[in-house]
Each structure stands twice: as structure tokens, then as C-alpha cells.
UniProtKB/Swiss-Prot annotation:
GO terms for biological process: protein refolding. It is an enzyme of class 5 (isomerase). Its EC number is 5.6.1.7. This is Chaperonin GroEL 2. GO terms for molecular function: ATP binding; ATP-dependent protein folding chaperone; isomerase activity; unfolded protein binding. Belongs to the chaperonin (HSP60) family. Forms a cylinder of 14 subunits composed of two heptameric rings stacked back-to-back. Interacts with the co-chaperonin GroES. It is found in: Cytoplasm. ATP binds at residues 29-32, 86-90, 413, 477-479, 493. The gene is groEL2. Together with its co-chaperonin GroES, plays an essential role in assisting protein folding. The GroEL-GroES system forms a nano-cage that allows encapsulation of the non-native substrate proteins and provides a physical environment optimized to promote and accelerate protein folding.
Length: 541
């Protein structure tokens, strides 16, 4: 395929145009007075959202260079969302500000590599300052406050805080669609572990890249499954029952995997294969935990159970299983409550006997998975569009609350970045282009606060200057237009969100500034339309 190549300033400006188009669409959503963006869908009703990553995903540009620029910024939003569950719009605004200021300096003759080193040094200093400013999240009210800001809804914040209170900080919280209106919190027995589907062909929800099995059987095998011959008798029995199947094994490959994938694609039989978590003895113990939770047995030749002679009565069951590429959540296993309690007591006894900190930590993890349970937040809304948008917002808020517990909280509303940069830059000692690179970061750290002020109908530059002179932790409450103690007023952000947004934005900005050439696919011309008359003669015109 022929390629288009652009060099130097032309290349950088092409990327910048794409970035600006995407960032301008995303940044209008920032802050309590942020606007919404309507996204047209090929099928179904349009979606109305103020979530940065959802908007970024939908933007596809025609110009090849602009398209690459937009894709790079999408990466910032996606990475920040993956790590922290929020901060996508902040990351996009920071990236735009850094690139815009950086390209001005490159055009004026600054050395891009010197700028890059300066940006990296400044970001490290500001990140360190943010973490030192962070306050630990200790109370249920603080968790509720953080989640409320992310979801822009105090009821959601309170329900998430309640859920975290019930299942613990390490517990699992999932969000499900409900047929009834409003929000409900349910606590169910369940477990999550860090292994996802073996093949993406098992996905049942392509938009979220998830596999969801309702009321499945669970095959737990402490062995590798390669031959379809071993699996076939059991598959036939499960198919007759009409239920889907989750296969947990050391590995599933070869013709066994091919058979499962082909049947899933054809719609003949719904199943998913997942590698067993852990290694060695720890894997055996975790498989046994899952077996007790689901009311099944571990199929292992060590205990005289062979796969080819396994019947349905040896399989576990659950109300629901959700599998992503990285993790599996089993909700409401059909195990016997007394057996689960016995297993929990056994693990507690092992923790007391253990001398090794590492073993104790791993046993604590198993205990949390088995005893903690799963909190399910059920979401209902008047319309399908509202339901999807609300569910997405609540999922973001859950991740946000967990991020707050992990690294603490800082003043929200863009204030922490401005004040952390102020404190960090007093200690930085850089010269030449590196000092210019650091100034680019200083300029960019004002951008989120300025944008929040602009969206609230205020003058961004004036607000940023005023906040810089206030006591640390004080800033603008954009909802009321007053200057307040941000943390006391419940306007807070998880330190992890702010830090991730800054680091990811700086990473992409450095790439933009050091780009000297862009190679893009040449757009193909549309083929000419054929003669609609089919070339037949003798027709009257």
C-alpha cells in the first residue's frame, strides 16, 4: 500500500491538528459545570456522555496525519482510564497544553531532546510532591465523597462507600443492569482472580471485551487439556443441559481449544476457557477454594478422577461468571455454606501457623477472595441510553474510589496540580532547554484548573493566578464560584488519578516533540460506480 510521509514541522503540525480536534471535543466535559457530548451510534439510539474516554474512542478523523495525532491522545485517555478509572479528560487537557507549548519552543529552535529531559524531570518532581500532599482515606464519608465526584451523583457515592465497607478494600464490586428503576446494593458470595480468557474468540460482549455466562457449569481441572477426546463426553452432557460451561484448567490448547472456539462462534455451545490462577501447590489450593465455592470437585488424576469419565455431578455451578482479558469473577457459587465456612477457618488457622510473610500475604489474599464476597450494584434507568451511561459512570466511580484508598486523596478541581507544581519547582535546578521543558510542565499544570473555570463561565487565567496564591488545599469550587478549603468541602481527587493523568500526558507530549517524520497510509480513492443500466443498449433516454 502506498504511504504518505511528512517531515519536521509539517509532521508535528499535522499530529497537533488531530490532537486539538479530539482534545477540544473532550475538554468541554471537564468539571462540575462541564457540558455533555452526543455520540451517534451506527445502530440504536445516540449516547449522551461526559466521559472523556468514551468520547475519545468515537472520534475517527479523515486526514491521515490528524488521525495519528488523535490516536496518540486516545492512548493517553485509555491508559489513564485503565490505571485509575478516571482522569481521562484531565490527561487529555494536560497533553494538549504540553504539546502546544512544546511545539512553540521547538519551532523557536529549542532542542526536543533537552525539552524531553526537562519534562521528565519536572513530572517526576510534581508526582512526588502530589504523593507527599496526599491524605489517607480512612472514613466511609471520604470514600463516598470521592465516588460522588466521579459519578456526579451523591447517591452513587454513598452506595459505593457502603459496598466497600461491606466487602473490604480488597473486595470485589461489580455493576449490573437491573429491570427496576434506581440503585440497589446486593451482597453475594463470590470470588475474583487474576486470570482472563485464553482466547478473545470467547468474548460475548465485544464493546466491553467481556465474556458473561449466566448460570454456568464450572469444570475445575488440575491438568492441561489438549485432546478433544478427553473433553467430548463431558461437553455432550453439558450441551444437553442447555447451560454454558466455564473451564478452569492448567492450560487449554490444541484441538480442545479449537473445538470450544468453533462451537462458540457458530453459536452451538457457549463456553469459555480460563487458565487456573497461581502456580504449583498454591494453584492446587486455589482450585480447591473455587471447587468448594461452586460446589464442584477438582478433576485430578492424583485423586483418581479422569477427565474423560467426569460426569455433570462433579462440576461446580454459579449464578453468573464475568471474564475479561485479565480477570475472572465468579458470583454466587453453588457451594455448601458449611463447607465454605470450614475452608475459611482452615485458611485462618494456616495464617496463624505461617512463619513466612509472603505465605501469610498469599493466604490473606485467598481468605479475602473466599470470605469477602462480591458486592453487586444494580443500576436501573428510564431508557436504554440513560442506563448505559449511568452504568459506565458508576463503574468509573468504583475504580476511582479504589484508587483513592490505594494512594490517598488530594484537593480536587485541578488545584492539587497547580499547588504541587508550585512547591516542586522551587526545588528544581535545571538550565538551558531542560529548564524550558520544565516550564512547559508548569504551564500545563494550570490547564485543567483553567478549563474547569472556563466551563463554569469564569476567566481561567485569573482563577489560576488566584489559586496559586491561596493556602495549600484551598481553591475554586466551580459549582458555586467560591474559594474554599477543597478537602473540607469534599472536592477531592484520588492522588493516583492526578498522578497517572500527568505522567501519561507527559509521555505522549515527549513523543510529539521528538517526532521528525510521520509515515501514514495513503487514503484509497473510492472505486468508480458501475453503469446502473448494466450496459444494455436500445434504451430510451
Amino acid at each position: 500500500m502506498p504511504k504518505l510521509i511528512a517531515f519536521n514541522e509539517e509532521a508535528r503540525r499535522g499530529l497537533e491538528r488531530g490532537m486539538n480536534t479530539l482534545a477540544d471535543a473532550v475538554k468541554v466535559t471537564l468539571g462540575p459545570k462541564g457540558r455533555n457530548v452526543v455520540l451517534e451510534k451506527k445502530w440504536g439510539a445516540p449516547t449522551i456522555t461526559n466521559d472523556g474516554v468514551s468520547i475519545a474512542k468515537e472520534i475517527e478523523l479523515e486526514d491521515p496525519y490528524e488521525k495519528i495525532g488523535a490516536e496518540l491522545v486516545k492512548e493517553v485517555a485509555k491508559k489513564t482510564d485503565d490505571v485509575a478509572g478516571d482522569g481521562t479528560t484531565t490527561a487529555t487537557v494536560l497533553a494538549q497544553a504540553m504539546v502546544r507549548e512544546g511545539l512553540r519552543n521547538v519551532a523557536a529552535g529549542a532542542n526536543p531532546m533537552g525539552l524531553k529531559r526537562g519534562i521528565e524531570a519536572a513530572v517526576e518532581a510534581v508526582s512526588g510532591q502530589l504523593l507527599s500532599m496526599a491524605k489517607d482515606v480512612e472514613t466511609k464519608e471520604q470514600i463516598a465523597s470521592t465516588a460522588s465526584i466521579s459519578a456526579a451523583d451523591t447517591t452513587v457515592g454513598e452506595i459505593i462507600a457502603e459496598a466497600m465497607d461491606k466487602v473490604g478494600k480488597e473486595g470485589v464490586i461489580t455493576v449490573e443492569e437491573s429491570n427496576t428503576f434506581g440503585l440497589d446494593l446486593e451482597l453475594t458470595e463470590g470470588m475474583r482472580f487474576d486470570k482472563g480468557y485464553i482466547s478473545a474468540y470467547f468474548v460475548t460482549d465485544p464493546e466491553r471485551m467481556e465474556t458473561v455466562l449466566e448460570d454456568p457449569y464450572v469444570l475445575i481441572a488440575n491438568q492441561k487439556i489438549s485432546s478433544v477426546k478427553d473433553l467430548l463426553p463431558l461437553l455432550e452432557k453439558v450441551m444437553q443441559s442447555g447451560k454454558p460451561l466455564l473451564i478452569l484448567a492448567e492450560d487449554v490448547d490444541g484441538e480442545a481449544l479449537s473445538t470450544l472456539v468453533v462451537n462458540k462462534i457458530r453459536g452451538t455451545f457457549k463456553s469459555v476457557a480460563v487458565k487456573a490462577p497461581g502456580f504449583g501447590d498454591r494453584r492446587k489450593a486455589m482450585l480447591q477454594d473455587i471447587a468448594i465455592l461452586t460446589g464442584g470437585q477438582v478433576i485430578s488424576e492424583e485423586v483418581g478422577l479422569k477427565l474423560e469419565s467426569t460426569g455433570i455431578e462433579l462440576l461446580g455451578q454459579a449464578r453468573k461468571v464475568v471474564i475479561t482479558k485479565d480477570e475472572t469473577t465468579i458470583v454466587e457459587g453453588a457451594g455448601d455454606a458449611d463447607q465454605i465456612a470450614g475452608r475459611v477457618n482452615q485458611i485462618r488457622a494456616e495464617i496463624e501457623k505461617s512463619d513466612s510473610d509472603y505465605d501469610r500475604e498469599k493466604l490473606q489474599e485467598r481468605l479475602a477472595k473466599l470470605a469477602g464476597g462480591v458486592a453487586v450494584i444494580k443500576v436501573g434507568a428510564a431508557t436504554e441510553v440513560e442506563l448505559k451511561e449511568r452504568k459506565h459512570r458508576i463503574e468509573d466511580a468504583v475504580r476511582n474510589a479504589k484508587a483513592a484508598v490505594e494512594e490517598g486523596i488530594v484537593a480536587g478541581g485541578g488545584v492539587a496540580l497547580v499547588q504541587a507544581a508550585n512547591a516542586a519547582f522551587d526545588k528544581l535546578d535545571l538550565t538551558g532547554d531542560e529548564a524550558v521543558g520544565a516550564q512547559i510542565v508548569r504551564f500545563a499544570t494550570d490547564a485543567p484548573l483553567k478549563q474547569i473555570a472556563i466551563n463554569a463561565g469564569l476567566e481561567g487565567g485569573v482563577v489560576a493566578e488566584k489559586v496559586r496564591g491561596l493556602t495549600a488545599g484551598h481553591g475554586l469550587n466551580a459549582a458555586t464560584g467560591e474559594y474554599v478549603d477543597m478537602i473540607a468541602s469534599g472536592i477531592i481527587d484520588p492522588a493516583k488519578v492526578t498522578r497517572s493523568a500527568l505522567q501519561n500526558a507527559a509521555s505522549i507530549a515527549a513523543l510529539f516533540l521528538t517526532t521528525e517524520a510521520v509515515v501514514a497510509d495513503k487514503p484509497e480513492k473510492a472505486a468508480p460506480m458501475g453503469d446502473p443500466s448494466g450496459g444494455m443498449g436500445g434504451m430510451d433516454f
